[in-house]
């Protein structure tokens, strides 16, 4: 498009062209008032993208303020590229999670790949070296050909980018439910390590300092990607493939090394990734955070397509690009540094004192807008909220224990449910050992990565049972945080903090906004009780297809500190003769459970309950026992209940089984999904010390029979299952469905 064809300010207003860009009538009137005139086409584009939900959080900010964001270890909370938490010895962990849902629904390979690329840039823009990747994925049922295609391509995209860039993908989760059929969720998390003195901010300080563009050249890909992420998917979304960016992991690898070298230079003032909204967000946010302005000369932007307009250059979301501010007079050092890596670094502007973002192109000023208006002054909406109609109905339901005829068959069927089944098909495509720091590989409760040069490790996990959150957003929100912490503890780590990715439907629908409010209330309470502040995250709204929303899915990414790698604990049984303990009581709680979904084809009723004080007490006891060397294996009891947890601990071991006795009604004892429960094994000689330290019930012992046998309290056998057969069923389920 040439400049001749761009509508003039009067046309933009009279023909409501701003509405096509995503601005409401009221918002356009606000822009007019801020500028004291009608905006031109480029300026309208700047406001439309910066005031989108994806960039401004205008619908979610009032809710996000409820999160606890401070703590004695928190060095950087929400507001920068990623959050930072102190781990002692002058070191810190940097991490964040983001969504790439809409792009992945349209172009799954590139959508997932660029989601990984973007989150890596957020972490190294803080000055940290990325050391691990995780992902949390949601798809429809694998029986659908479209879902199979999305699943295979998303996993290939994550693998393709992560493996090429040389950062191990060490963990995550994949869940399958019909509500994600047309709108998969792809949440990527990156974890990095940094020394305190190397922490950098995305701020443009110092009038007269130079603004430079580094990395890949700018094309027309991803224009309006942020606006696209702020609307519902529809049949016409397929036509928006151009809004999906294309990634180059080899370019990003060079960019990481160049930027980490740059961070050691005192010439650098500020650095930010050109993520959602590209040059617009990076320039406006860096200026606004520093209380400064920026002037940019767009003719100097490296362009890979001809005839690009200022509008296109400012809104492009081409990948592998960073905006940096350097001390005036030091530009050549930066050019030389990036040239060494074969990357472009060009001067394209300067920092000013007047807080304005000014853009020049072909000798003319093409935009003049207050930086704060773009970055900080988006309207904030307090959306109407209304309790979902189904909620009262579910709360009043009298829940009956599901009828199960054959316990062994039911266990095998549960092990083959895609949400429970082995995800080896997924993680075998990821290089999870690159950099040789991975201590606990995918498949256990949490991954653990060594902190080089120390005896410490970082435990990390992603968790969210969206079925519970759909049934009861507040309780489900508590459970999401508690389960993440439980997984960290089972791996020998002390939970530190969380990043979140709030995936919801259309916030303009009061029942959806109610889900958002309630789940954030639950998560906030859990974060306060478990002392895991929220240090950053991402909101992804409008996850709907043809008016049907996905389950509310506020994914929790948590990192914990393993104080000594000797404490690392995994879920599989270690040796015959060890004692098996269960911590926590089992109630007949089946709402949202894997058994309920399998038997009824839907979920209903009340979610499992949780008492956060009890949760904290149990986690502290388990962690102390692990740190005292009393624990052989630890596994959190989650989907599928105790029978599945015990089976998973046997499947992961070589030739070991277990004989256990469970009290209470058999179906609940085996398959209920009550919270705050652990399966722990302990050496016989540590029995007394363990029982003194932890409130736990001994239920049996590990055997070398290669069978799991579960009795009831009358000592009648409820089921006996061969571990090899279980392993085969559990490992074969997903590959079988993909055939």
Swiss-Prot record:
Mg(2+) 2 binds at residues 122, 273. It comes from Bacillus anthracis. CDD domains: PurL_repeat1, PurL_repeat2. It catalyses: N(2)-formyl-N(1)-(5-phospho-beta-D-ribosyl)glycinamide + L-glutamine + ATP + H2O = 2-formamido-N(1)-(5-O-phospho-beta-D-ribosyl)acetamidine + L-glutamate + ADP + phosphate + H(+). Transmembrane segments: none annotated. Substrate binds at residues 99-102, 121, 245, 317-319, 540. ATP binds at residues 57, 96, 500, 537. It is found in: Cytoplasm. Its EC number is 6.3.5.3. Disulfide bonds: none annotated. Belongs to the FGAMS family. This is Phosphoribosylformylglycinamidine synthase subunit PurL. One of its GO terms (molecular function) is phosphoribosylformylglycinamidine synthase activity. One of its GO terms (cellular component) is cytoplasm. It comes from the Bacteria. Pathway: Purine metabolism; IMP biosynthesis via de novo pathway; 5-amino-1-(5-phospho-D-ribosyl)imidazole from N(2)-formyl-N(1)-(5-phospho-D-ribosyl)glycinamide: step 1/2. GO terms for biological process: 'de novo' IMP biosynthetic process. Part of the phosphoribosylformylglycinamidine synthase complex involved in the purines biosynthetic pathway. Catalyzes the ATP-dependent conversion of formylglycinamide ribonucleotide (FGAR) and glutamine to yield formylglycinamidine ribonucleotide (FGAM) and glutamate. The FGAM synthase complex is composed of three subunits. PurQ produces an ammonia molecule by converting glutamine to glutamate. PurL transfers the ammonia molecule to FGAR to form FGAM in an ATP-dependent manner. The active site is at 54, 100 (proton acceptor). Signal peptide: none annotated.
